[in-house]
Amino acid sequence: NNLLSQKLDDAPDGYSAAALDLDPQGRVLHHADLLVHDGAFYLDAPAPQAQSLHNYLTRMVFWSDVTIELTELVVLTLLGDPIDLPEDALSRPVHWGGKPRIDVLVPRDRLEPTVAALEAAGAQLAGLMAYTAERVTALEPDLLLDLDEKTIPHEVPGWIGRLGDDSWPGAVHLEKGCYRGQETVARVHNLGRSPRVLALAHLDGSAPTLPAPGDELKTSGGRSRVVGRIGTV
């Protein structure tokens, strides 16, 4: 609770949300979706960040009676109308700006039978490109493609007051106690706004090639200036 941006000290079993690990200046170091189940907190971080988040949390244990370990779980994401899940499935709802989403956490050695059970219940398999299209529509960032080392939480609208849904806490709790980076969050929220924000850019298809992640966005006209950069395409 004292390390991440989400309020977790009174989280009940079944609670799901997101959380951020910030540096002292309020810049985002790690993002994770989380689930509380049977006395454990499951943090789902992007694979390139999992080990560094694990290392940080391990260093912060001190005298606390807690064990931190990497699991052998994989995540299956269901989008669209709900279907019946296997009885032993560990799942969490994820509120975002796209289609209804349920993440199912599955032991790696149970992946194939779980997929078969979901298909039997009506799910259809789709690849990463299909998921990425839904993620972009939902304004859900990929930390490596859409954000950078200067990103602060208010740059992602869904992290602060999750898209106007009062039942979903987003990734930042604005009324919890101190945590690293909180001063930046409070200052931006109460006194101003982020100088940058994640936005959806529509491409009209008139150019023969697509832009690449990292390409600059510029204003048109004689005195063009850089106003942003391309993320996920």
Regions found by a protein language model. Name each.
Residues 1-233:
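Basic, glycine/lysine-rich polyanion-binding surfaces/domains
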